Amino acid sequence: MSKILAKLPTEMRGELKDPLGEIYTDTDELLADAGDPLVAVGDIVTYHLLEAGHRPAAAIVDGKTERERVERKVLSAIEEFDERIDVANPQSTITDDLLEALSTALDRPDPTVVVVDGEEDLASLPAVVAAPVGASVVYGQPGEGMVLVHVTDETQAECRDIIERMQSDYSQIESILS
């Protein structure tokens, strides 16, 4: 059973509405600026990358967009990944299973999709912490587009700080991601 290692407190919800990077509406422009490996968080973002001919090294999806089920064509495209890991991760949380799956996906030589039963909305934070410097993480910004986060020491520190300020067991999170 999954153990919740971080929970987003209500008072921090507004803070996470600000994008961590530049917003793109054109997938090709995003891909031209993205580092390698590329991690995608969200079904629609992953779908757009796949439609543009790019399979991210790791994708984290939950079968929903803005809490509604995604269209069948999106699910079908995502099912094309050769490697798949299924995890449970309740809304507004980060679980040990999600972190272990993210770490495993980044270590695999083949692109891997992590399918979340629950919600993946906070997964971009540990993805930035776990990805190597020089990589990129892309996630959806509802109603605006795709946010591209370049993984640097600074963006990792920013995401680490956000996770630490959540109701979290950061030492355990760090031990899984390192």
From Swiss-Prot:
Q: Which domain of life is it from?
A: Archaea
EC number(s)?
A: 2.7.1.237
In terms of InterPro entries, this protein maps to: GTP-dep_dephospho-CoA_kin (IPR007164)
Name its GO BP terms in alphabetical order.
coenzyme A biosynthetic process
Catalysed reaction per UniProt? Answer: 3'-dephospho-CoA + GTP = GDP + CoA + H(+)
Q: Which cysteines are joined by disulfide bonds?
A: none
State one molecular function term (GO): GTP binding
Give the keywords, sorted: Coenzyme A biosynthesis, GTP-binding, Kinase, Nucleotide-binding, Transferase
Biological role stated in the UniProt entry: Catalyzes the GTP-dependent phosphorylation of the 3'-hydroxyl group of dephosphocoenzyme A to form coenzyme A (CoA).
Question: Would you identify the family this protein belongs to, as annotated?
Answer: Belongs to the GTP-dependent DPCK family.
Q: What is this protein called?
A: GTP-dependent dephospho-CoA kinase
